[in-house]
């Protein structure tokens, strides 16, 4: 029985570790562990996890350290308990333990006492062993790949040495002493390093190198992520921190290299070409009988021309040459791709407007709005006299989109080139890209945002312009949306800044047109470059003349004022007749173009006898505002200055009355301090008929249809509301006419007659004046086709003013005075103030008669014509005048 118990021990001892491990196991209290395992197999109890862990730790200490298993630097999971058949024979427990305690169970923790933990522990141990053995396996594979060819090379070299020894022995036996000396010298030469490189057997080494180079990328791609583990294993370090795989890091570095360096693709192509030539030359050297230099040359020819391999002979040489030719085709395809990408990128850069503009004395427009079309048109007309010019547009839009929008204008630019660039006016680099410092004029357009945001952006653009290191050559014209923001922009920009407050200008012009019908057309002619416009020039030959003589000195122009040099360049419009032109003074005129007029000899004029009629007194008027503008408080102040006492201003809009009072008070308007007008509030929608019918529309002298503040951001919506309100008001007025005859009624009853409806609206227009604020010039045809309204083109007039100030910044002061409620103003006067009916006079005679009223006559409109003529060409030609004719004058507002 004892013998049978010792046999298993002897078998086990043949496979167990050294004696140290056996001694260590004997010293540990592992009896309970073995009993528990045996009991677990018999259904008696479970194993103890704590004792298992202790036994596993003792086993770890006995493994060699280079395997990394016995390291205590990292906490390892305990291995599963060994099978009872292998453990129970090792240490035989006393029989008394089995007899006295047949059902005793060891004390175990609740977490480790469950039987299912054994398979999990076995699986984890297998995974751990696999993770440990994998780097060793990969290292073994790589070592074999590297050293197997090298061992073959050493064997080859050993064989060569043996052959050489045999040859030397044979030659020594049959040669003389002198031959022996020379033979030893030859042997030494043949045994040099160049011998192994140049002899035929060195081609085998080249073949091994080629094969190894072909296999190496696949091995690296497959197992490169295990390289850090091998390094840690060689350094005997263990790191638990998670790291990015090496394959991803390499891909990231390549990506960064190609992204940062602009010539990375070209360098990569050059490296690939050189590598293919060298690799192909080495392969050709291995399969052919030529030299290395010849093989490299053939490799280059195969890369450069894929057809050169057609005459090769031999299977190996053909395979190599075809492979090199295929690589050469790939190289040239990559080269063509790079060239194509470079050309496409350059063309795309030009197409997207990223290139630099190298121009001088050009007009630079910053921003994009619906006013740009009419602005370009006016600037092109202004440049017509000089054979055209250059206009550069910088906006935050795509260049193609801007060019398409400009092409839709269908306007002949008459030699003017329009260059579009995509960029932000707030970025200095983009401003330098359009040669901002060399522009003769810079126009900053208002954005499509609300007034405060648009003016804030304009202020930032002005700050960017002031930050340009090179001094600006030209002046800056800024389109403002709110009059309150104008002083801040001028404060920041200084003397270079000229502002045009578009909203305020249109509001003042609407009031002037409402009080004097037809004035809108006159302002279009004066502000636009198609007809007559303002010019200021120095004429030394006029020094010493009185202004009344200067007035008739220009056959093709009409003098309107003087720029006084002694008063700091102040422009005086409509000066006194006795003002003497001094040295340095300049003359303000209205002319066709800046090169179409010059002073001439004084003509013969006759003042003669004419009626001395004073201006009729002003009578109270009744005016209606349909809509709400954000600067309506300024318009009320202008009306307060123009209207007679007792006038009424009706305000009809959707803004509640209390909110109106708060807005007017915020605009610093004292409603109770108004002396000439009385405010009447009505609430309603101007596009709803029943709301309009509640108003006495037939009693108003003037009706102003304003672009409502709620829809002013949308040009189409605003114009649609204005047009609908205009038609509704005219229709309501025509139905309320007291002199409507029965004929028109029968026409409406028998069937709708468009002409009769238009005729009734024209009759209503004779009773009251309607001024519509139209934002889009295309809406002009819808309003002017029936002549039912005297209209104002807001964007058209603002664009004209911007273009005129861009051409000459001094004109801005002239426009400011003519638009103001004080000082000189543009007026339309009847002919009875200057002549008798059917009197024959020349235009010079009428100009002299106008000076008696302190007025400057600049044009006229005949009763038989629809449009006024400003700056007539033949001023000395006499003609008959009618009392139905009217004259356009610049008169003092005092």
Curated annotation (Swiss-Prot):
Gene Ontology terms describing biological process: monoatomic ion transmembrane transport; nodulation
Region (Disordered), start-end ranges: 1-124
Domain RCK N-terminal: 360-501, 620-769
One Gene Ontology CC term in the entry: nuclear membrane
Residues passing through the membrane, by range: 134-154, 204-224, 267-287, 319-339
Bilayer topology: Multi-pass membrane protein
InterPro entries per the UniProt record, alphabetical: CASTOR/POLLUX/SYM8-like (IPR044849), CASTOR/POLLUX/SYM8_dom (IPR010420), NAD(P)-bd_dom_sf (IPR036291), RCK_N (IPR003148)
Outcome of mutating residue 305 to V: Loss of function
Effect of residue 351 to I: In sym8-5; loss of function
UniProt biased composition (Polar residues): 7-16, 24-33, 44-63
UniProt entry keywords in alphabetical sequence: Coiled coil, Ion channel, Ion transport, Membrane, Nucleus, Transmembrane, Transmembrane helix, Transport
Source taxon at top rank: Eukaryota
Coiled coil: 390-415
Gene Ontology MF: a single term: identical protein binding
Cellular localisation: Nucleus membrane
Leftover remarks: Can restore nodulation to a Medicago truncatula dmi1 mutant.
Official protein name in the record: Probable ion channel SYM8
Species of provenance: Pisum sativum
